[in-house]
Amino acid sequence: MANGHSFKHVSYLWDEAKAAALHGDEVGLLVYRSNLLGADLRLTNYGGGNTSCKVKAMDPISANEVEVMWVKGSGGDLGTMKRNGLAALYVDRLRSLVNVYRGKAFEDEMVQLFNHCIYDLDSKAPSIDTPLHAFLPFKHIDHLHPDAAIAIAASKDGEAITKELFKGTIGWVPWQRPGFDLGLQLKKCLDENPGIRGIMLGSHGLFTWGNTAYESYVNTLEVIETCADFVEQMTQANGLVFGGEKLTALPESERRKQALTLAPVLRGLCSSQQSMIGHFSDDPRVLQFVNSQDLQRLAPMGTSCPDHFLRTKISPLVLD
């Protein structure tokens, strides 16, 4: 329990003292919020997701006040990101790119045009997700790939579940390749559903927001917590997971002994072109999947969120 917020499936890490020390520094609070979100891998995988804030700043050429968006730049990790990991861009210039946008076939050229919108010349390179934040009017925005949300977003009835679970307070945008047009689709969803607290992207992830860094942080946690509660309830109601158990797991000591024997062989094979580090996991949830009836059917289907491809590649090797 912290400041009236209690969560079961996510970690509430906000420290009032640390946040107070950053009072008035919206970009500093953005970095702080990003680090907290990235510290919980249930919210987004390493290197995944992006966050932003919009602030007023003085234009160095005209001396006029302008709106600037600070957003996680290309690459990097939310959990360890510093200020130099952000890109700062003129909001009005980003939004005016709609006047030269030629359609989905020309998404790549739009990424190059982001460079003409840069406010801080020391910025990190803008990512392809930049327009997704630019076309939403909110001061603080989080875009994450939480496992619990993706379980809904990637399901056959994802849109209907989202609508029912959140009583219409979370919008829905079907899957499409990230880019400029997806930013326009987010804006359209918001225009058609004023007052929503977030948007679920089919087979992709989640957008949430707030007027302050703290409001955005708590909103994000609350939405993900609701998704996780739903997944847990459905799992318990359905009884069998992944078709039920096919194999019984070995005792822990025996599992570790076999892993110790097998690891050098697998690591050697995986390191044939470059050195690799191996990791062994016998988490109960992992065992539930690898020992299941549906392993052979589900494993080749790959991950449910394209963002995870960066770390796991498309599908795993299954050894009997």
Predicted features, each with a name:
Residues 1-320:
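Glycine-rich flexible loops
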